[in-house]
Amino acid sequence: LDGLVGSEMCIRDRDNTMATQAICQPANYGADIIIYSTTKFLSGHGNAMGGCVVDAGKFDWNNGREFEKLTEPDTSYHGIKFFETFGNLAYINFCHASALRDLGTTMSPFNAYLTLTGIETLNLRMQKHMSNADEVANFLIKHDKVDSVSWSGFKKNKSYQLAKKYFKFGFGSVFTISVKAGFDGAKKIVENCNLFSHLANVGDTKSL
């Protein structure tokens, strides 16, 4: 996609929630803004809600027509010009100074504490997540009732070479399966699973 952009004024935004910075660092491959749902793998225990915006600090925001919030005076902050004051870190400082103030999306202190505690073990947890995914995916692909398993760790998967290129280790811990029994069969599997929980979260201490 970056090759198709063709404009230096296009911001490259990446959601790195599923890989995390433990195995993939988009800023090293041209991303300008990286976002995370910290509720998932970063906190790692399904007990803290939050989100994160990371500014790679490489994008030139000095374009009045496109980014006037960053280049023109902000009257709510005594006329500060964010780009003039912070340079290429204008966007992240604007997010902190204005967006948080206006929208109120501030993480609670206890959620922040739980998230930071979880991040301390991120590297080890991601390795275990991926080794578990490897075993389960390889078990399922051989099952006579499974039609297909889509996981970047399989050499025949269309994302295999990309995962090898961009991931420091492993192939991620999330995959999808298609069962031969179709929708009704898949529904029956979900309803009768005991070890795996049918929940909206990922990256938990539980198998989801």
Task: Give the role of each language-model region.
Residues 1-6, 11:
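Single conserved hydrophobic/aromatic residue that forms the stacking wall/gate
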Residues 3, 16-17, 41:
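Generic detector of well-ordered alpha-helical packing
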Residues 7-8, 19-25:
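Active-site core of PLP-dependent enzymes with the aminotransferase class I/II
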Residues 12-13, 34:
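Hydrophobic beta-strand scaffold residues
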Residues 17-19, 154:
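Active-site beta-loop-alpha junctions enriched in small/polar residues
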Residues 33-174, 178-190, 195-205:
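Active-site C-terminal subdomain of aminotransferase-like
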Residues 208:
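Glycine-rich phosphate/pyrophosphate-binding loop
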